Amino acid sequence: MNLELPKAEIRSATRVVGGPVTPRKGPPKFKQRQTRQFKSKPPKKGVQGFGDDIPGMEGLGTDITVICPWEAFNHLELHELAQYGII
């Protein structure tokens, strides 16, 4: 009496023979830019249109001391400040 079980054959992955051989490439590598490049110019400090050219504001002049640096950009929205890296 034969008590041996038949051995299962282990096959490796099927290889295509005779086809073009191409080396396998990894995922594409992206280089990060070191400097930011903006399509438009960054905003200038100061309130636009403020000074002696506004009727009723002649006595104030244009010499305004900025106490907080955010006051220099108070004419801009937060998303504009973030776009140019100010905040």
From Swiss-Prot:
GO terms for molecular function: 3',5'-cyclic-GMP phosphodiesterase activity; cGMP binding. Residues 26-44 have a biased composition (Basic residues). GO terms for biological process: positive regulation of epidermal growth factor receptor signaling pathway; positive regulation of G protein-coupled receptor signaling pathway; positive regulation of MAPK cascade; visual perception. GO terms for cellular component: photoreceptor outer segment membrane. Its EC number is 3.1.4.35. Residues 16-54 are annotated as: Disordered. The keyword Zinc does not apply. Pfam families: PDE6_gamma (PF04868). The modification N-acetylmethionine is found at residue 1. It is an enzyme of class 3 (hydrolase). Belongs to the rod/cone cGMP-PDE gamma subunit family. Participates in processes of transmission and amplification of the visual signal. cGMP-PDEs are the effector molecules in G-protein-mediated phototransduction in vertebrate rods and cones. This is Retinal rod rhodopsin-sensitive cGMP 3',5'-cyclic phosphodiesterase subunit gamma. It comes from Cavia porcellus (Guinea pig).
